[in-house]
């Protein structure tokens, strides 16, 4: 195999694909800052239509629906990933669904002019559907066009796009920018602009070479794309690996969601995929970001919104750090370090929130614990679950696996957003102990069950789960579940 390079074509394709991740992050964070202003809009609109003052219960219910409907759309979208990528390809699927982003953005952007609560809620549902699809398309596309030796580092770009989107939403939501009574519809409708930019650029990006060869049997086209993306003429080994995988697929029936759980070959990797997604959402990170302003306020910070933005900056910085670490330390090791660090920080958050009224300096301990909590999240549980799912499965079951994993992520996201306020009300500062328990469970699971995939081809990983070639694995590098994450990789890549 020739030396694989990081080419301009590869960076361009990765950057354009990551716009979908940015959209997910932006639309996740954009609804938080203008909460009071949007509630005033709901109140005024309902009063104008019914000529009666709406009850507090109705207003709260509509606000909660406006927030939660995004996750409902995400669940539906993530479960529909396979319907698109198997028929239209990875790139074309990303291109097509931008219509949803434009439609959702228009509905939200014009809801105030139309004085329509329904347009706001429908827009959030549609944009959630779009983001749910993106959470499947983007990591799948990135994983399939990246060189094996850099697949983990480039896989982290998906999470980097998400956290940059959240940070931009937080900044744009400031009152000095678009978080005002007049401009909040533009804040929500801004999602149209990245959708248009991505739509204009995607035709210049290549289709996934794995999709072209394995699904459409276009070997020459796939070979040409690999040579252009990786900057080497010698891609024969990669082409042969894809052809072998294609031959295996031809002997198997199409893999459905149910088949993932019925087949012994797929059962372990799909359980690992689901648990990794749950480890991301049940770690407490969304509880921290959804309610960070209130947490900082409780900790005694005078301008909590800026402290929340500070947490977003830390989020972004450590995602970049993870990008450089993931191919050196390995996925499994970083995930365990992240989970362990978050568990310690969640205990510190609980203690500092309990004692801040007695000791003023505990407020600073709380803020520090939150920032370090976010940093550990981006070292492991933030980026790794998204791209490792694509690594655990071959071409056939990958779309169904991405759908199940994505739906697990969105469902747990929805449940945390729904249940955390009540849990915080009844448990107070002790609420983060719940997340500590989850973090410890996921840490133990990762130690015993999650394989190290660094430097492994898709075929090697799949065969290890199928139980094939175990003798060779023991002789050369040990069983996959026991792989040392610090082993040197075989492939090389240069910039």
From Swiss-Prot:
Topological domain ranges for the Cytoplasmic compartment: 1-10, 86-90, 143-153, 205-269, 326-331, 390-399, 451-495
Gene3D superfamilies referenced in this protein's UniProt entry, alphabetically: MFS general substrate transporter like domains
Membrane topology designation: Multi-pass membrane protein
Main location as per UniProt: membrane
NCBIfam families referenced in this protein's UniProt entry, alphabetically: SP
Subunit: Interacts with SMIM43; the interaction may promote SLC2A3-mediated glucose transport to meet the energy needs of mesendoderm differentiation.
Biological role stated in the UniProt entry: Facilitative glucose transporter. Can also mediate the uptake of various other monosaccharides across the cell membrane. Mediates the uptake of glucose, 2-deoxyglucose, galactose, mannose, xylose and fucose, and probably also dehydroascorbate. Does not mediate fructose transport. Required for mesendoderm differentiation.
Protein name, UniProt field: Solute carrier family 2, facilitated glucose transporter member 3
Gene that encodes the chain: SLC2A3
